[in-house]
Amino acid sequence: MHDAIDHRGERLAHREKKEMSQALSKAEQQRKAIAERMDKHSLLASEGRAVVDQDDLFLEPPANVREVLSDSLTVAKTPPRIEFAVIPYGFRYFPELEGDKDVGPWSSWGQACYYPAEKKFFGAVGDHGWYDPNLHVVEYDCAAASVRCLPEINTLLERKPEEFGEAKIHGYPDVYRAPYQKNDHLWFCTYWCRYPEPLEHDFASGYTGGHIMSYDLASKEFLDYGVPLVRASWPYHRVDRQRGILYGIGMFGEFLAWDINRQEIKWAGYLPPEMKWFNRCLLIDEASGLAYSNNAFGESQKIIAYDPDRNRFRELPFDMPKDRQYNCNVYMRCHTRERGADGLFWGLTTLGSLFSFDPEGEKLEVGERLWPLNDAYSVTMDRSPGGRYLYFGVASHGRGYPYGSPVLQHDLKNHTTKILAFLHPYYYEKYGYIAGGSYSFKLDEKGERLFMIWNGDFNEIEILDKERRDYDSDNSANWSVPSPHDAFGHCATFVLDIPPEERKE
């Protein structure tokens, strides 16, 4: 590990991870055999090249969705063109582990970023491991219609196999160029995969916490800025691009405000008494500099604000409304990255109700659920450049396929929700791939292309359907917690070309 970090970050030498020599576990041998049998077009060996489809079958809803279409949902008239690529990470299957270790499944948990200068989208995947884990930033090249994994993060950090590591990038990767940098950088933080936190022997192995890192988009080098808060790791992070402040939220509500330009900590630690930052939401109003989230302390239903100029927190003078259907507390969950021309952030609550937040007036309005069926949990949203449309998914935790793995568009002008495409069962029947759920929806600068990383699996649908029998989807508390029927293990990118007639502003 590196004890001394340069003021401007340490450039990490390129290192390739060594191939594993251990034999696969029996369960992994079986999983590999099923995946290779289901992979009808050898996409696992395609090295990230996309296949392209445009089919009216994208617009065919499953029976359970068809029942609610006339009342709550519509389906697009024109099928989109979709590029589909399996992400080509190494070490796809795992050996038998000894001792207190865990690994798998390969999965993607962070948001996505678009870099218009190179027409590339970025996201992340990892193997959820504790020791000798694998974590990659993912790059999708629109011109080449292909996806690749950038060098493995733990290897770049020179973590040894016997040292606890990290296998998630769980927040927003953001592009920002500091005054001392010649090029644009992609900024992010790392996150552990043992919950609620590593054990004492994990820390004793040499692990100290989550890192701040960046990727030089011109030189293609990674930089490490070290661990800003010992024994904290970062399930959520964002960058205020106007002020150069990187925000991180820890597992236990630790709050990080780190000045990229000065390489200085503004705040690192817990909030004042009876305040706890919700670690799955961070609205940054770049016009005012204020940041917002829910207060996760106790039964509080307040929203809290952080002012970086005053370095102070405060509660807003109103409560977040309870969910209308379930009469329970909810938080703001997915949301647009910035306020739009209407002055509003838009998003969905933890149970899928549409909300808008006005940072100037500090007012919140909560409306109806946009997805009328169960599993309305959504963690990703983007807004069209003209502001009329919101794009989002549902059943994000790997369980969208019972509903057709829909890609949704909400029209803020007409107050209607439209399904642009059902990814399931089309990709299962043609390619053997079950599209589970996505944590990353990102539009290009024109709002014409929608990039998504989906968690999914090359598996027999009967296996997952059997696991789903005991799942109670009527209990909303189950929507965001792991279930045996979640489709994980083989991450893929989908790039959807939205037909012009389906996105008129």
Predicted regions span which residues?
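Beta-strand-rich domains and repeat architectures in extracellular enzymes and scaffolds
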Residues: 88-135
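Residue-level detector of Asp-centered blade-edge/turn motifs that repeat once per structural unit
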Residues: 114-118, 181-183, 240-243, 285-288, ...
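Surface-exposed loop and turn segments in beta-propeller and other repeat-based domains
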Residues: 82-101, 150-171, 226-231, 270-275, ...
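Repeated scaffold domains used in trafficking and secretory/extracellular systems
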Residues: 107-111, 157-178, 231-239, 274-286, ...
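Short loop/turn segments that connect beta-strands within beta-propeller blades
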Residues: 141-144, 216-220, 259-263, 307-311, ...
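Blade-level signature of beta-propeller repeat domains, shared across WD40, Kelch, NHL, RCC1
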Residues: 432-505
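Short, solvent-exposed loop/turn segments at conserved positions within beta-propeller repeat blades
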Residues: 129-134, 196-209, 251, 296-300, ...
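Loop/turn-rich, solvent-exposed surfaces of beta-rich toroidal or solenoidal domains
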Residues: 373-412, 418, 422-426, 431-440
